[in-house]
């Protein structure tokens, strides 16, 4: 039996899905499924001595000093070795953008922007460079317009 037939046989699930679709539409369901998938993706922090695995959705921002990257998460700070440009290639699809020369930030963790400062949900204040400001502001505007849908 295929999955769609199983869903229609379960009245509770079928009703919940119908309600969701009538309120948010098919694109809302697609976005919800993508968000669920993204929230469960894992990110590896590796140094010579340690190996840590964190969920991408729990990362607040990454900060680089030389080739040492500090990965700030809701559970603490993890270390890894690498380059910020390589990390951006991996994390951009999950809503990470460059805030300045040495910081990548998760757009969903930005609470507000005040002049050249990005304020995060954990009350961290990060400098936003003039060269990165347009992309950060556009990403926040897109986030706000998605939330209004």
Language model features with spans:
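Short, charged, intrinsically disordered terminal tails
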Residues: 140-149
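Conserved binding/recognition cores within well-folded domains
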Residues: 26-128
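N-terminal regulatory/sensing modules of transcriptional regulators
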Residues: 1-33, 149
């Amino acid at each position: 039996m295929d999955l769609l037939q199983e869903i229609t046989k379960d009245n509770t699930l079928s009703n919940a899905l119908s309600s969701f679709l009538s309120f948010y539409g098919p694109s809302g369901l697609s976005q919800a499924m993508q968000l669920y998938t993204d929230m469960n993706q894992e990110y590896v922090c590796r140094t010579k001595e340690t190996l840590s695995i964190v969920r991408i959705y729990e990362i607040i921002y990454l900060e680089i000093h030389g080739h040492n990257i500090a990965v700030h998460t809701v559970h603490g700070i993890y270390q890894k070795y690498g380059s910020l440009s390589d990390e951006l290639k991996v994390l951009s699809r999950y809503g990470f953008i460059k805030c300045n020369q040495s910081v990548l930030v998760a757009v969903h963790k930005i609470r507000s922007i005040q002049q050249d400062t990005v304020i995060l949900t954990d009350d961290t204040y990060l400098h936003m460079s003039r060269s990165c400001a347009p992309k950060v502001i556009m990403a926040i505007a897109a986030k706000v317009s998605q939330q209004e849908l």
